[in-house]
Each structure stands twice: as C-alpha cells, then as structure tokens.
C-alpha cells in the first residue's frame, strides 16, 4: 500500500513528488481545510440561536472555536479521505511555521487516521532536504497549534466585536483589526504631522572651485564662526529655528549680498581630514527585510513579494520564506563562499565564515534565513526564471552571497576652506576596497544612504592651497514635511515596534488598501478621510487597541503562550471578559459614541466640516442658513485639504462651476469642475436633451488653475484623428483614458491596438509620424494586462473564463466585467473554481446594492448652482462541524 503525503498546494506537491520513492502518493489540501465561519450562512442551523454564534467562538465555554469545512473544501476533504483508505501511513508535510502546523492538526482532526501518522518538516524543497526530513519525522507540535489558534481567536474577537460598532457609528462595511488598526493609526499620525507641518526656508552658498589637479564643489559651513542653518534646525510645527539653536540663518537678500562680497576674496585650504571606515554586509533576508528590499528595489508590494517568494519556495528555488531568523546553515555558508570565490576571487571572501545573530527574541535559530535552496546555489541566469520571479531570486541570491564577502573599506574625505569670515566644506569619499559592494548594496529610504557604494573624489589638495572660485551661487531651500510611509518603511516600523508578525504584514497592508483606509500613490501609503474617522473613534474610546506599546505587549504575550510560558485561557478571558475587557468596553462605550461626531473628521482651520458618508468623504457647511454639501475628490488627501481647496469646492457647489470661456466652434461655455476622480472640463450645461455633456479629465501636470481655453478645447476634442496607417489604411487616433494619454490604431472587428504616450509626448500635439513610431514599439502590460496569471476555470452560469490578474493593489479574479480581490486565505495556484465563483458573486452583489455615483458640480440649464447626485495546549472541546 502507498504512503500518503499531504502538502498545501499542487505546485509544492509536484516538486516534492520528484524526491520521494514511487510508493509515495502526494496530495494537496489547498491550504486550510477548516476555519471559523466567515458568514452567518456558514453557521450550523442548531447553533444560529446562540449569542456567540456570529463570533464563531463560544466565549461562554472556554473560548471553544467553532470550526467548519467551507463548501469549496468539502470535495478536497473527500479526496483526501479516499486516498487515506488506500494508504498504510500518513505523512503531514505542510509548512514548518504555526500556520502549517495548524493545517496539519486540522487534517488530523478531520481525517481521523487509523494508520501511523508522522509530521514531516523541511525548510527547502531539495532532494537532500526531503530525504533528511523523511528520516526525522515527529509528532504535530501542539504548542505551535495552540499559538496559532489563540492568535486566530484573538483576531476574531477584536474584528467581529469592533467592526459592527464601526458600521453603526461611521459607515457600513468598515473593519477593525488587532494589527490592522494600529497600522492605520501609524499612517494617520504621519498624515497629521504633515498637516501640522509649517514650512521653513533658508539659503546657503555653493562654490565651484578649481586647482591645478581638478575641480571640486564646496558648500558654506560657517559664517563669522557660527554654523549655517540646515533643514534639521527647524521646528516642523512652526517653520522657525528650534529654540536654543545657535546657528546662522540667511535669507535670500543676505545670501546674495554675501555671494557678491565673497566672489572677489581669496580662497585658501584651511584643513584636510581623512577618516578610514569599513562597512559590513547586511544579514541574509528575513520575511520582513525581504519585503522591505523588494519594495525599495523592485517596487513589488509586500503581498506580491510573498506570492512570488511562495512560488519560488514551492518550486525548490529558495528556502522557506516565512522566517524571523538570519541564521545560515553550514552548507549554506559553504555554498555562498564557494560562489564568492568562483565569481570574485579569494580576496573578496570574508576572512572567517560570517554568521549572523537573530535579534528577535522569538525567532527560531533552527530555522534559516531566506536564501537560495540547495548545497550549491544556482546562478540567477541559470534558473530559467523570468519577470518578478527572476528579479526576486536575483535579489535573494545577491544578498546571501554578499553576507559572506569581505567588508568594504572606504576613506571619508573632508576639506575645510576659508574665505574672508566664512568657511566652506568639501566632502568626498574614496572606496579603497569594494568588498561586498561588488555584489550587493542594501537599499534605503534615504536617497543619500542609497548611494553609499558611489565614490565622490576630490582632487589632490594640501593645506595652504589657494583654489580659484569659478562660480559662487546662492541657493534657496525649503524644509519638507515628514515623508509618508512606503510599504517598506511601514513594514520596518511595525517590526521595530513589535506589532504583529512579519509573516502577516503583506496581508495587513493589502487589507488596509482593499478596505479603503489608504491609497497607494507613487509607492506611498496615503491614509483616507475614513482612516482618520475610524482612528479617532478608536483613540478616544478604545485607546489600548491602537496603542503601539499595548499591541507590542499583546504580541509578546502571544509569543509567551507559544513558548508555554503563559496559559492561553486566562489571557483570553482577561482580554475579552475581564472587568475592563473588550466585551464590557464595547457595551459601555456604544451608547456614548455619537454617530454624527464619529463621522466627522477633525481637521483644524477649515471653513467646513469633513464628514464620512455612505459613498465617501464630503464637505458640509452653511450659506445663508442653508446646508451645503460637496463631495471630496478621491485622490485628495487629508494633509492636502486646505482653506483654498475647501472654498473652491463650496463655491462651485453654491455658484456653479467656474467658466473658463466659450468654445470657439459651438459657442457653448466650458466649465472647470472637480469630481470624485479629480479635475475635469465640461462643454455646456446638462439639459434634458443632453443629460451627459462632453467631459474630459485633466491629464497629469495640468491643473484647473493653469489650464488655458485652447488646452480645454483640445481636451474636449479627444479622441482626435491623426490619420491612417500607411500599411493597413486603418484610422489612428490620440486620446485620454483611465491610464493616461494614448494613441490607438483601429484593427477592425472591434479590435484596437493601444500604446501609452511617453513623458515628452503631448496628446494635444502628437502627430501621425510619432504615433506610428509608438505603435511600432512592443506592447507593455500595465499589470492588468491581457495575460492572466492563471485561468481558474469556466463560470458555471455562462461558461466564460474566470481568470486571475495582478493589479495595483494585488491579485484579483476577473469574470466578464466583475472583478473581485483574491480572498486572503487563498493562493493563485490553488484557489478552487467554487471559491472563485463565490467571491465574484459576493462582489457582484455588493456592486448591485451600492449603485452608482456621479461626480459633483454638473451645471444644468437654467440653474446658477451645480447639483450633485450621490449614487456614487487547550483542554477545552473544540466545536466542529462539516456542514
């Protein structure tokens, strides 16, 4: 009889099958086979009347979780049970972390095997690793199971207790989460700091100097013995120099006068300093640092990074990608050092094998950092990988190799020059030995730090040299507000604060964006007005749940539970049902929370209130005793909402939109408006005969304040015909779409060939020759390209394909015109047709319930003001069921 091996995914099954004897049968569980109920329909009929049933956790009975087998997993469970009937041994080979241990435990509970059962663990899928794992099987680790279950229960209690409160008090569909809400608050706090920021300005001088050996640059350092002010000397809340700072602050007039005075004065080298330094390579990747570097260097989201890493792991290219450890095994160190010696030579090897120590208290040193799999590392170009998979493997390979390379040696150079009563400083850097720089330089959110492998050479100088000043310029500077978080910097902050676990960061950030708490704009996470409202409510009424210190202590308690140092049941009881437990706090606070106040976003200094409505944020003010409401554009951020913007939106609402001018051909007025999706121009007013007048969005770089009448007429004429294709005779046009300006060639039969315009192209002036040049270039995918990641199957209703695509916010399912985010617990390689159909049906139902929404400010004939239509180790018995 065969031995049955169960893993999570078909990809992992295919890979591991290659390394097992022929009498082993490998099946995939497709992830979790049991979970807490996701909706009321999942709850067994006999339990629907229980007070706790909606939680899916029996808080009256030692927090016993109610586990159900989802509908889309019942067929899988049956397949596994049938396979087990023909097996003489069961081997559970799910991932080695808490989640994997939990899947194995649930499989045991469901399958109830009557044959010997083993737990097989490995951190890479290679022949050597699989053979070693087979010889060293163990039992399911109940501590890991309990740890995962406690986290799951705690997350459910927080989410399912607080979210309904948010629905009642702010808006339906909002959610709160143990880690999610803390992460959102971090974004909101940074945005508040940006609103409170006051800009300061300062001036300095920059000199271009020459000596016989060459040219160099120097900047003003001191004046009359006092250090010149820089941006770091300003108070962000006042825009003034921080009290007590003894610095020299120059304005434009003073800087220019100083420039004129110093230009004719002699310059002399006062001192030289050379300081040798060394730089050590960064440790190999953990889950967190991989997400950070991938975001900085590859512009991959945390979610996409983990998806690609999962694929690389399951196909045997890298070790397990969910780890807090920076430890490398002896075989990995030897493999890395062998690569270094072969590619760069012995002198680029570190003198001794370098081993890193994991700082995380709960990281397991038996686990390894993320590295290329195997006893020898495949070169990136020899893997056959492409796209994001190649880029991520290349990143992991380089980081691992660099960890065993010699330190980089460099010399920091500093030259002080004096001219009259001023001192200038020239700085340089000489790389004496590049060491690990040859392979890898760690990324940084600081652009200056990101250039640390670049030399800045100075000509040969000595004290007393008299350089000639070729040019002296006065340069103005303005201080900048605190930078918004990128995915990389948010992940780093969460890890530094001890909030959540790195393995969950990708899904947390994805959820924040999916739920509308943040927008991803130019790789930065910008919180929405809804995020402000929810954070304010939680800060006022449930401050512990969004406090970083409290969250870190909670995370530590959960780790202590997993280590057997803390009992899980008293902890849960105290958290949820204690005197100041969550259950009691929600009961007490619910009546105190005024919905009108909760829906109001507190932004100081504005002549209107910002409120959260059914369809998003809007302004509310009064004029002549009458209330005025105006929708806020979706791309408008809380930090950028100022008095001028508020007044413009309200004025458009009361007086109608501004009129730019009259169309030279139709004599119709051209209006300037702002809608939910940004600024646009409109030709004429809306009438019964013409309810939808011609509109055109403003392209990037154009604003309502600067657009000319000629430009507006041009935009309203789009798409414009440029001519015919010389080979096919088909029409070529230029236009403006959701992805920006483009040219398009009609191919006939409803098919069209599009190309985006380049930065230097203008949609209003591009000609046929340039359009043909663009159309001749290879077509690029925008992420929502024509090539799906996977086709799940045919929809049972219309036999149309259901496909998985990659979008700006992660992976999504597509069926016809309906798109739905890939469910959090599902993987693109393993999601079943039934689950995909259910997710699409739920999304279609939401869209139908919500209806549509039109933009603001459309003038109607005969009206003086615009109108807006808003359509816009546990001893308890777990409850289980397979219904």
UniProtKB/Swiss-Prot annotation:
It comes from the Bacteria. Its cofactor is Mg(2+). Residues 2-126 form the Toprim domain. Residues 867-883 have a biased composition (Basic residues). Keywords: DNA-binding, Isomerase, Magnesium, Metal-binding, Topoisomerase. Mg(2+) binds at residues 8, 95. The active site is at 320 (o-(5'-phospho-dna)-tyrosine intermediate). It catalyses: ATP-independent breakage of single-stranded DNA, followed by passage and rejoining. This is DNA topoisomerase 1.
């Amino acid at each position: 009889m065969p031995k049955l091996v169960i893993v999570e995914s078909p990809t992992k099954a295919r890979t591991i099958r290659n390394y097992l004897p022929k009498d082993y049968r490998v099946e995939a569980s497709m992830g979790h086979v049991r979970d807490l109920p996701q909706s009321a329909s999942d709850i067994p009929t006999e339990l629907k009347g229980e007070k706790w049933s909606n939680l899916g956790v029996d808080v009256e009975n030692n927090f016993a979780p109610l586990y159900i087998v989802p509908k889309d997993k019942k067929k899988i469970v049956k397949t596994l049970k049938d396979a087990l009937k023909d097996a003489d041994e069961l081997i559970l080979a799910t991932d080695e972390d808490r989640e994997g241990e939990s899947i194995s435990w649930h499989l045991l509970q469901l399958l109830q095997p009557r044959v010997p059962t083993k737990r097989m663990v490995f951190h890479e899928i290679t022949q050597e690793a699989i053979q070693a794992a087979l010889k060293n099987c163990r039992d399911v680790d109940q501590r890991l199971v309990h740890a995962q279950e406690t986290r799951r229960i705690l997350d459910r209690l927080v989410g399912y207790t607080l979210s309904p409160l948010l629905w009642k008090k702010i808006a339906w569909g909002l959610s709160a989460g143990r880690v999610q809400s803390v992460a959102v608050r971090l974004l909101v706090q940074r945005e508040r700091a940006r609103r409170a920021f006051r800009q300061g300005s300062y001036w300095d001088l920059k000199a271009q100097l020459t000596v016989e050996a060459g040219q160099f640059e120097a900047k003003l350092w001191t004046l009359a013995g006092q250090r010149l002010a820089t941006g770091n000397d300003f108070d962000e809340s006042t825009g003034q120099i921080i009290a007590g700072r003894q610095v020299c602050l120059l304005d434009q007039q003073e800087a220019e006068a100083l420039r004129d005075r110093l230009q004719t004065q002699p310059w002399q080298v006062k001192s030289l300093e050379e300081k040798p330094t060394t730089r050590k390579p960064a440790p190999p990747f953990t889950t967190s640092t991989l997400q950070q570097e991938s975001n900085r260097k590859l512009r991959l989201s945390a979610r996409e990074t983990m998806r690609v890493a999962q694929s690389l792991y399951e196909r045997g290219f890298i070790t397990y990608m969910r780890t807090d450890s920076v430890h490398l095994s002896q075989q990995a160190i030897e493999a890395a050092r062998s690569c270094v010696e072969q590619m760069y030579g012995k002198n680029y090897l570190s003198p001794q094998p370098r081993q890193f120590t994991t700082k995380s208290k709960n990281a397991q040193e038996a686990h390894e950092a993320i590295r290329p799999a195997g006893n020898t590392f495949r070169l990136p170009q020899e893997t056959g990988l492409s796209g994001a998979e190649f880029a991520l493997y290349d990143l992991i390979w380089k980081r691992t190799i660099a960890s065993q390379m010699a330190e980089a040696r460099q010399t920091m150079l500093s030259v002080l020059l004096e001219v009259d009563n001023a001192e200038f400083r020239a700085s340089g850097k000489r790389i004496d030995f590049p060491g690990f720089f040859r392979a890898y330089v760690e990324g940084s959110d600081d652009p200056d730090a990101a250039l640390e492998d670049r030399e800045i050479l100075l000509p040969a100088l000595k004290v007393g040299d008299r350089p000639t000043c070729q040019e002296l310029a006065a340069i103005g500077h303005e201080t900048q507000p605190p930078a918004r978080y990128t995915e990389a910097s948010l992940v780093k902050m969460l890890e530094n604060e001890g909030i959540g676990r790195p393995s969950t960061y990708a899904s947390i950030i994805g959820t924040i964006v999916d739920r509308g708490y943040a927008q991803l704009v130019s790789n930065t996470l910008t919180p929405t007005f809804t995020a402000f409202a929810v954070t304010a409510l939680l800060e006022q009424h449930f401050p512990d749940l969004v406090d970083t210190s409290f969250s870190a202590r909670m995370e530590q308690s959960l780790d202590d539970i997993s280590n057997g140092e803390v009992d899980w049941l008293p902890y849960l009881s105290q958290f949820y049902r204690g005197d100041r437990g969550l259950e009691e706090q929600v009961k007490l606070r619910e009546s105190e929370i005024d919905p009108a106040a909760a829906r109001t976003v507190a932004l100081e200094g504005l002549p209107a209130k910002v409120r959260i409505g059914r369809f998003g944020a809007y302004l509310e003010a009064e004029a002549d005793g009458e209330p005025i409401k105006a929708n806020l554009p979706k791309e408008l951020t809380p930090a950028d909402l100022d008095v001028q913007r508020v007044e413009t939106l309200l004025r458009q609402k009361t007086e109608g939109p501004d009129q730019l001018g009259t169309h030279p051909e139709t004599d119709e007025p051209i209006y300037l408006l702002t809608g939910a999706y940004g600024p646009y121009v409109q030709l004429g007013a809306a009438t019964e005969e013409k309810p939808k007048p011609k509109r055109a969005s403003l392209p990037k770089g154009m604003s309502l304040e600067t657009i000319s009448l000629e430009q507006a007429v041009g935009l309203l004429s789009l798409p414009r015909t440029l001519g015919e294709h010389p080979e096919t005779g088909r029409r070529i046009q230029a236009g403006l779409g959701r992805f920006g300006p483009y040219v398009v060639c009609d191919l006939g039969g409803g098919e069209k060939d599009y190309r985006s315009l380049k930065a230097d192209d203008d949609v209003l002036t591009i000609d046929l020759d340039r359009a043909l040049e663009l159309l001749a270039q290879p077509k690029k995918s925008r992420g929502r390209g024509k090539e799906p990641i996977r086709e799940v199957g045919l929809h049972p209703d219309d036999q149309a394909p259901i496909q998985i695509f990659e979008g700006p916010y992660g992976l999504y399912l597509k069926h016809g015109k309906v798109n739905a985010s890939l469910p959090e617990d599902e993987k693109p390689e393993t999601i079943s047709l039934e689950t995909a159909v259910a997710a699409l049906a739920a999304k279609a139902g939401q869209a139908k319930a919500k209806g549509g929404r039109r933009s603001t400010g459309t003038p109607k004939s005969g009206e003086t003001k615009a109108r807006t239509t808003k359509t816009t180790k546990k001893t308890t018995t777990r409850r289980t069921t397979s219904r």
